[in-house]
């Protein structure tokens, strides 16, 4: 096996140009089997406004996947209505010559195949050489693959390079999707503007190598090269499920730096050699070396679990940084790679991994959990090294671009250092400690759900044979046989049977409520009963993945399994599943929950005196607001306010922050839209500074294009911005998109800042556990609450310290409150 492996063993379209003969459209093209089968035309490029033969103006080239039936019949390139819609907009915007062409030049009845792309690529390559474009827009994955030889990222604003040209290729949505989806259409226009003014994005390391560190000279050379980098990015590939498999191991570990096009890769046999791995160990443990990873807590945890090394110097996470700079950005490496010219870097291994995943599922059936965790062992050594190396190189380049972006948003990076970096460390310990689950209780809960489902099936039996899991059969029963009506349609034109529709029909026929109950039971069975059992490890605990970047609001999310959407404790199912949450003998579970946190955050940020006074007084906030508006809203004195009025006030209080419409508020509290508006106006009228703050956040968002969260105050008492969330829909002509973006302008600061209070508290609690050697563990976090498992004799100490740590923050005179049970 060679010590150096090429990162890009295959070329792109530009390298396939054949200079010795012209490649003009040919109705009897000998290269393509598609013509012979479909008898379709071979359609060439439409030069549009470009003067024939004039390449001095460096045109834009737009590539569509292949001719439509309309193009084929008319013999006119790119004349289909979907293509024309794109053409009209591009021509009107760019004000420069544009050439339109295809990835595959002939129409076919089915989707474009890889073989057809390869057969037609010389034609496209000829176009690229002839027109020497400054930028290529590839509409649809087939068009993108025709140009660069790899798949497009899932996100529309990815890019790659056309070989050795000084020309980049931007992946755009399929033109047919743009024609039918207004959301994608509006997003496309904004992304097009960004890329049209992008300058010169970075090129991929076409001459880079994955260097296999298989001898001590190579190991020392790797250390010397990496230690000179501004920072070192690292990535691991593993076999097995951490916490669950005794044979969990590292298959490889790769390092790279932002100023390098090479990666240094230690494979499994090199990792197990103490002498050979010593330089890599020094990199991981040296606090003077700035380390960066993509979802770094996974890599850190894997290294700790597999080889016992603590990565003390980890300082950056490109995945989390991406979310801090742009909440709405998809943050997977396959997506981020497209922002630094590395798009498609995972394609070579993808097919092998998918085949191995299918093989494992076929082998073990439903018993296997997370088959992809075992699939990487099937990669040939060279492909594994290249895959791992490209991951490290991509992470380095992504992180470097984010590092540069932080120069424009220094407060965001400061917030990473002050809060989020520590949260990543703390969450890794929460995952490691795990949440205690009693397997027998889960089995008992599963049996109970089966009994309930059997009873509902008896209800279904009176309506004849139908499958309650089939949306088509449910629709047939409800709308054709029973005559109910749905006010919502699916994309295919059928009446919808989604949850919202069925809830509107609830009470109009017994079978509707039975179907809703059936779906709830099935979801509980798949998530918290049968679905929970494979996640209970030998230690009697569940070790979920807790994600720092899982929600746009900044809140943590949880998966494998999701422990954050458990039914409320005041419901039957909620009580039953909670019986499985059992601390180990001699220990107790403690839950600490912030009280009305988001409303307190709104008071802190707006400094509304009335809101602040209510919280300082310690009274029930929702009851007090109901009393404040009782005469205006309901025509009753404050002392006559009842529970129903408090419930209505609570809905409006949160609705103000979430931007709920009067119609939605009316449905929530069971009154007319007019009455809901009166309650809203009455409450908001008592909080004038809150109203002005909401208007100010919206005004600032429209000016800057961003919503912000806040953390701390400066010397003048002003809130310091922490995270940024671009609001791309503020200027949208679609009223729904625009309204959603406007709501986010003031909801993001509240929810995101509340999330940061929770993150900061988690860090402090975990630090306290370690610093004081406290006999307890922080075992789960759910939105505004944390759960600890502590020794019985330490409960009082735990409660006092938890309250102290969670309420210690600077809140501009608005006290925080924590409910502990």
Predicted regions and their residues:
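A polyanion-binding, active-site-adjacent surface
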Residues: 2-203
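Metal-dependent phosphoesterase core characteristic of DEDDh/y 3'-5' exonuclease domains
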Residues: 148-154, 158, 166-169, 173-176, ...
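Conserved "right-hand" nucleotidyltransferase catalytic core of DNA-directed polymerases
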Residues: 197, 201-268, 309-313, 338-573, ...
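Conserved pre-motif C helix in the palm subdomain of viral-like polymerases
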Residues: 390-397, 743-766
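Short hydrophobic/aromatic beta-strand micro-patches
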Residues: 668, 787-791
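A common structural junction motif
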Residues: 686-687, 804-813
